[in-house]
Amino acid sequence: MNIEKVIAREVLDSRGNPTVEAEVHLDSGFSGRAIVPSGASTGSHEALELRDGGERYMGKGVERAVQNVREALGPALIGMDASEQAAIDKALMDVDGTSNKGNMGGNAILAVSLATARAAAAELDIPLYRYLGGSNAKTLPVPMMNVINGGAHADNSVDFQEFMVMPVGAPSFREALRYGAETFHHLKKVLSGRGYNTNVGDEGGFAPDLKSNEEALEVLLEAIQQAGYEPGKDICIALDPAVTELYKDGQYHLESEGRVLSSDEMIDFWADWTSRYPIVSIEDGLAEDDWDGWERLTAKVGAKTQLVGDDLFVTNPERLQQGIDRKVGNAILVKVNQIGSLTESMDAIELAKRHHYGTIISHRSGESEDAFIADLAVATNAGQIKTGSASRSDRIAKYNQLLRIEDQLGDRAVFPGRKALR
């Protein structure tokens, strides 16, 4: 299954911003296509996302990245075996020649990397999840559904970026999705009843102008109960406060509440919330380079709460290993465009599993109809997925693909529920 041709084009993501789409064509006539996502809150240690600058698309065009695929990355792969994913990704990175993919762009490299995997699966006539994960790929992920948006994902007064529901008590993925969707619809009624708007943010969650961060928890608990579910049993809460965005001059600025907290005060803040609410997971609870604070946070609440590194680990095996060595966090968020290739993403997942860290496959705030991460979640038996709320077709595309996979697996499908949590 040798690569015959690589095509790239500029397309739009769910926010109307340009992104890269690549197609890999094989000499057998089969092909694969992939669109890369883009984040709003990005860690400083992520692979470089190459943008054009200038006036076109307000500087966010990706014609340079597309040109790099056409003129450098694609030609380097001609004649290579598409089933040799590690060799493909190494060839792409060799063309780039930097540690952060700064020459070709992580968005250019990733588009080709993912499209190659799809092309190989197409030629073998097997589902993508089976191609990537083999016969043992059978675990459907528990969804983390982002139903209240704040921070960089919304234009409102809520400091924290994501308030999510996790239907850990559901018996299957299909039922978990129903639990979450019903809660989402009841949340709309709760917010309307309190006089709040029900506009949605980048990831499909509501973005009300709440009085405080804690009110987000209150309305969420009310919605869970109105939907007929028991908080802490049927549905738990997961948070992504993304506090790197709030970290300035060594302190955490909660602007909506007029508070400035030290690392220790931020740790106490999370300890208090986890003691009073059914919060089972906190992502980026401290800033990406506050390693000492992360050690103390993990020691204080890590035994009972999943502590997820996103900006902290940026899907990078080297940063994850540093976290493992320092006993920092206990789970990793996996965003393929943070590291910029499929092979490196799967290396990070393997390293996490080897050291008993939880794994959560994640979308970005700028998404598309591409549902690659749904297959990746099942392929790696990750157990958890973050791909937005129960609205916006760019988010629903992933959920619908998981429903299809669950149907294909039939009785072999496993839904871990609460066991998915670290």
Swiss-Prot record:
Annotated cofactor note: Binds a second Mg(2+) ion via substrate during catalysis.
GO annotation (BP), single: glycolytic process
Domain of life: Bacteria
SMART domains the UniProt entry points to: Enolase_C, Enolase_N
One GO cellular component term: phosphopyruvate hydratase complex
Pfam families (alphabetical): Enolase_C, Enolase_N
Catalyzed reactions: (2R)-2-phosphoglycerate = phosphoenolpyruvate + H2O
Places the protein is found: Cytoplasm; Secreted; Cell surface
Active site (catalytic residues): 203, 335
Residues the record lists as binding Mg(2+): 240, 283, 310
HAMAP family: Enolase
Protein name: Enolase
Species, as recorded: Deinococcus radiodurans (strain ATCC 13939 / DSM 20539 / JCM 16871 / CCUG 27074 / LMG 4051 / NBRC 15346 / NCIMB 9279 / VKM B-1422 / R1)
Lineage: Bacteria, Thermotogati, Deinococcota, Deinococci, Deinococcales
